[in-house]
Amino acid sequence: KVAERFSSFVNPLKPIPLFIEQLTGISNEMVKDAAPFEEIAEKVSALLSDAYFVAHNVHFDLSFIQEELERSGMQRFTGPVLDTVELSRIVFPGADSYKLSELCEELNIRHDNPHRADSDAEVTGELFIHILKKLAWLPPATLQALKRLSRSFISDIEDVLEDIISERLLNLSEPEHIEVFRSIAIKKHSKQAHNH
């Protein structure tokens, strides 16, 4: 669930290029009275403290935040990151595309203002909730395998997977349709499948 929301226009202290205005719908007029990043840097830093930074293509978004925090005299974010592009590739391997707008369409997530930071953040949060739900349904053996592989991921997902595994192990048996063979969870063959 979403615990808190924060959204603010930021005055970039320079003109917004026309192509950015066309992409985002944010004009120079809309930000002329907004605070520069320095004035909200402390709030942003506080929100990031002891938190995961979740984004769709996390290093792209984080690079802007890092640059602005540093320019404002604040410490760079050093916490864990979760990349919903990477995680979507894992839990939705059959998706036609991993663009945020197309994943939203496929998962029936309403995305009214693509390329606007607040709208993108909102739907990325919803996408992440879908990812967590999908992970929660995976068999413990699959989660354990993912956890072992996660050391090579962009996403710092190991602790998240550990929490899901711990919760799943409270339900000690695998679902009826799953069998584990050499630590790999696979769907059992149904008798009907063998007869066709």
Question: Which positions does each model-derived feature cover?
Answer:
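Buried hydrophobic packing segments
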Residues: 65, 87, 124-128
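Conserved NTP-handling cores and scaffolds of large molecular machines
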Residues: 92, 107, 131-135
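Acidic, divalent-metal-coordinating active-site segment for phosphoryl/phosphodiester hydrolysis
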Residues: 116-131
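Acidic active-site catalytic centers that drive phospho-/nucleotidyl reactions
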Residues: 57, 61, 83, 120
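Conserved beta-strand -> loop -> alpha-helix junction used to position metal-binding or nucleic-acid-contacting
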Residues: 75-88
